[in-house]
Amino acid sequence: MLVGAHVSTAGGLANAIERGGDLGCESIQIFNQSPRMWRPTKYGPGDFAEFRMAMDASPVEAVVIHAVYLINCASKDRELRRKSLASLTHALRIGDGIGASGVVLHPGAQKGEALGPSMKRAAKVIAAALDDSDRCPLLLEQTAGHKGLLGRDFDQTAELIELAGSGRRLGLCLDSCHLFVQGYDVTDEEHLGKVVDEADEKVGLDRLRCLHVNDAAAPLGSCRDRHANIGKGEMGRAGLRAFLSEPRFDGLPATLETPGPSRKGPDRKEVQAAKRLRREGLERRRQ
């Protein structure tokens, strides 16, 4: 597992590598543009080359891009779907340029209609974005289970992948907090193992490409997407120890998206706390 954190690209893409290194990250996650604006940040071949050179010289082994929050691939609004497609395609092309492990996407939301039409619209946008980019994987994130959000269980994610063509570039991102507030008890090895078995059966672990590591500030099954710092939430140290040491997660980028002690995102202590829990968990599993 490559433990890391979400970091800023302020001042240029390559700066994210330095920030990740300062935090002790083995992987990083970035936004390819402001997450709350449609206007894309323009990068060119020189930016991509600088990023790759910085990464080659750093302890950071993997980078994941998170698509902007404004995207709703399932929207009935044609213009919103057009903007969503353009933004998602832009993210995938940047992923192509920097060699990203994937672009993480919140698939979208259904509003005031049956699930079927929303799923079909989302799948169409996803397929179009993949067609208009080269090789970067697109990773559908399991959402927190709130009614109306697509990807709120493994069945939905599997169906969405099938509707979008089941291509090899389509993958999965699991978030510890989202799973917990969905109602999946992932706080001990036995229960987590059953959840991973279900993910394998319904989606396939060959599609699991990255993880988000967050404690939960809301109770099990609450469907409330509220992240807490490592070991400070409802999952606690024991729960995250189990998640971080799951053998089938080995080798995956694992990004912290925690608030951090100063509410400015994860800091070095948060990253080190996650690494320590992983070591403790691996030791327990060997006993």
Describe each region flagged by the PLM.
Residues E18-C25, Y43-V64, A91-G99, A127-D134, ...:
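Acidic (Asp/Glu)-rich catalytic clusters
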Residues R39-D47, S75-S87, E113-K124, G148-Q156, ...:
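Alpha-helix N-cap and loop-to-helix initiation/capping positions
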Residues A158-Q287:
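Histidine-acidic metal/acid-base catalytic patches
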